[in-house]
């Protein structure tokens, strides 16, 4: 009987510790913000809205920015109004940067020196850096993929950009290498969001 009582008390203590740790994690994440970057035109809709839903449902705040303020239009016709640009961003305000893909990424994001600079800052501050579809090319051009496993939308030009930057290209849906997360296409948008969330939680333990 005594033995059973000891076991029950031990289980209760372990359960209490797990609940406390879970509450602490939620508390740590409560004021955390994720920066999502989109092209002003032709961003890929699912790659914005599906990860955003994952982040917000887990208590994270999300700021969406672009290269210009105002209405941004996705490839599928969804619209979102952004009130800040990448030029207004302070990396210290965020736990992660997520660069959304779509065909607009090549035109508006690949060569954007400010965005490339932001990626470097997030990476050097040990924050989570992530990109999906065509946008891992931005990470490649920022020089943070050298020696890292990564994926990208399977367009020859995009794959070549990663290899040229020294990345270990993998033809997989989502690739995680430390704080760097890349995804291949909108088919993996939700899984990508979940992996970014995991990395944020790990970084904020």
From Swiss-Prot:
Pfam families xref list: DJ-1_PfpI
Annotated source species: Methanocaldococcus jannaschii (strain ATCC 43067 / DSM 2661 / JAL-1 / JCM 10045 / NBRC 100440) (Methanococcus jannaschii)
Highest taxon, organism lineage: Archaea
Family the entry assigns: Belongs to the peptidase C56 family.
Protein name per its UniProtKB record: Uncharacterized protein MJ0967
Covalent S-S links between cysteines: none
GO CC field: cytoplasm
Entry coiled-coil feature ranges: none
InterPro entries reported for this sequence: C56_PfpI-like (IPR006286), Class_I_gatase-like (IPR029062), DJ-1/PfpI (IPR002818), Prot/Nucl_acid_deglycase (IPR050325)
